[in-house]
Design a protein with these regions (language model features):
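Hydrophobic anchor at the beta1->P-loop junction of P-loop NTPases
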Residues: 9
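Conserved lysine of the Walker
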Residues: 17
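ATP-dependent small-molecule kinase phosphotransfer cores
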Residues: 27, 31-123
Length: 173
């Protein structure tokens, strides 16, 4: 049996993470390699709560902790799949929480360090993390062409900060 692996695709909204993830999945499975695709927030109870928007009105730190709780459950599932020899392809993981939540917390380095510390307790280390980088203006235009509603995470100045956070994280890890 082939040994499994955990590969993460990170990047701002509209960067193409989901597309790249799907293409890698298709390439692997066409060669008979067992692979699964997952994403964060997940579809667990905590992930569904985050996705529903019902968490609106809570503090930014509490929201960040919800993402950590979702990731804790997700990591257990990922570890099981990898131990079964599967390649797990994940659309967003740890870096997304740090990039987005630290932007919401005004990019303060103390908040960024706190986000890293609370996440490191619960995350599995990916075998590879691929940052799909894009100019936020291009990403925003892609999001707009999907016909989706622009969320609080998709304003241009916010996406500029998110991209900066991702690039800083890429230098650190």
């Amino acid at each position: 049996m082939m040994s499994g692996a955990f590969i993460v695709f990170e990047g701002a909204d509209g960067a193409g993470k989901s597309t790249v993830c799907k293409r890698v999945f298709d390439a692997l499975t066409s060669k008979g390699i067992e692979a699964v695709v997952t994403a964060e927030p997940t579809h667990t109870k905590v992930g569904a709560f985050i996705r529903s928007g019902a968490a609106g009105g809570i503090s930014q730190r509490t929201e960040a902790l919800l993402f950590v709780a979702d990731r804790n459950d997700h990591t257990e599932w990922i570890d099981e799949e990898v131990s079964r020899g599967k390649i797990v392809l994940c659309d967003r993981y740890f870096a997304s929480t740090v990039a987005y939540q630290s932007a919401r917390l005004d990019g303060d380095s103390t908040d960024r360090d706190w986000l890293i510390r609370i996440n490191e307790q619960f995350i599995g280390k990916p075998d590879a993390t691929i940052l799909v980088d894009i100019d936020p203006r291009v990403g925003m235009s892609r999001v707009g062409t999907r016909g989706e509603e622009i969320s609080k995470f998709e304003k241009l100045d916010f996406q500029d900060q998110v991209r900066s956070n991702y690039l800083d994280l890429a230098k650190s890890y």
